[in-house]
A protein has these predicted regions:
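Short beta-strand-alpha-helix junction that forms the catalytic/metal-binding core
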Residues: 17, 41-61
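Short beta-strand segments
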Residues: 18-20, 28-31, 49-50
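Histidine-centered catalytic micro-motifs used for acid/base chemistry in nuclease
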Residues: 30-38, 52-54
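Histidine- and/or cysteine-centered catalytic micro-motif in compact active-site loops
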Residues: 22-23, 36, 41, 57
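Extended charged
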Residues: 3-4, 12, 23-26, 44, ...
Length: 141
């Protein structure tokens, strides 16, 4: 993938994970370019199918385009930062991300966004005054 494409995806996301909103500047691990529709499921490598993604969200998402809502056990697609508004599906409650919809809850569950260590990291960033990022810069809105 050309470096210019990575730069475009990074700029569009304002340097934040498009799923959990973690700023790249506050994670020691390199961020990934996520195929929203995974390559395993014929997802193309085009800007419209790429999301800037922290390593944790990327690794937990893997090739999954969907998952089960933990409240209803019904299969739902994961959040799509190209076609959906982040604030329609998620909201912050201190360091915990809350799902407002089945898509939000499913995404939080599959990507393990509220794992204890990830919450602890966000609480530290909140204490430092650098999280959550101001909407819309990291939300794609």
């Amino acid at each position: 993938m050309p470096p210019s494409r990575r730069q475009q995806v990074w700029e569009r996301a304002n340097g934040c994970c498009e799923y959990c909103q973690l700023p790249q500047d506050h994670d020691p691990r390199p961020f990934h370019l996520d195929h929203i529709r995974p390559q395993k499921h014929d997802g193309p490598t085009v800007l419209e199918n790429l999301a800037f993604c922290c390593a944790a969200c990327s690794l937990f998402k893997g090739p999954n385009p969907a998952g089960f809502d933990p409240e209803t056990d019904v299969l739902h697609p994961l959040f799509n930062p190209r076609t959906q508004r982040w604030s329609d599906h998620f909201e912050w409650n201190e360091g915990t991300l809350e799902g407002l919809t089945a898509v939000g809850r499913t995404t939080i569950s599959v990507l393990r966004i509220n794992d204890p260590l990830r919450i602890q990291h966000r609480l530290l960033l909140i204490e430092l005054g650098v999280f959550p990022p101001e909407l819309p810069p990291c939300s794609g809105e």
